[in-house]
Amino acid sequence: MGKAAAVVLVTLVALLGLAQADLTPKVQVYSRFPASAGTKNVLNCFAAGFHPPKISITLMKDGVPMEGAQYSDMSFNDDWTFQRLVHADFTPSSGSTYACKVEHETLKEPQVYKWDPEF
């Protein structure tokens, strides 16, 4: 009985450890409407599937943080990973680069995800 209890205990500890595993965010950068230079739009950065919940998401224009970014409340999925949406109004111009910078403890360094406007 002692061995069986030890096996159960080790299994439970392993499962708890897996439930709290650090998971890297999956990031999507997209606009609300099809891109058109000079036309008002909304730039979105959606990060999902990450754990732990502490994350920094910054919308960038030409490497500089964009003003007016709005952050949705942090929410979690059925598997206890987290997700967050950051968005800002903007008017795309053909000479500018738009991106989303994400910092999370599972990343060795901040990652920059560029928006592809497909003008």
From Swiss-Prot:
Keywords: Disulfide bond, Immunity, Immunoglobulin domain, MHC I, Secreted, Signal. GO terms for molecular function: MHC class II protein complex binding; peptide antigen binding; protein homodimerization activity; structural molecule activity. It holds the Pfam family C1-set. GO terms for cellular component: cytosol; extracellular region; Golgi apparatus; HFE-transferrin receptor complex; late endosome membrane; lysosomal membrane; MHC class I peptide loading complex; MHC class I protein complex. GO terms for biological process: amyloid fibril formation; antigen processing and presentation of endogenous peptide antigen via MHC class I; antigen processing and presentation of exogenous peptide antigen via MHC class II; cellular response to iron ion; cellular response to nicotine; immune response; intracellular iron ion homeostasis; learning or memory. Residues 25-113 form the Ig-like C1-type domain. It is found in: Secreted. Disulfide bonds join 45-100. Residues 1-21 form the signal peptide. It comes from the Eukaryota. Its main location: secreted. PROSITE patterns: IG_LIKE, IG_MHC. Component of the class I major histocompatibility complex (MHC). Involved in the presentation of peptide antigens to the immune system. Heterodimer of an alpha chain and a beta chain. Beta-2-microglobulin is the beta-chain of major histocompatibility complex class I molecules. Belongs to the beta-2-microglobulin family. This is Beta-2-microglobulin.
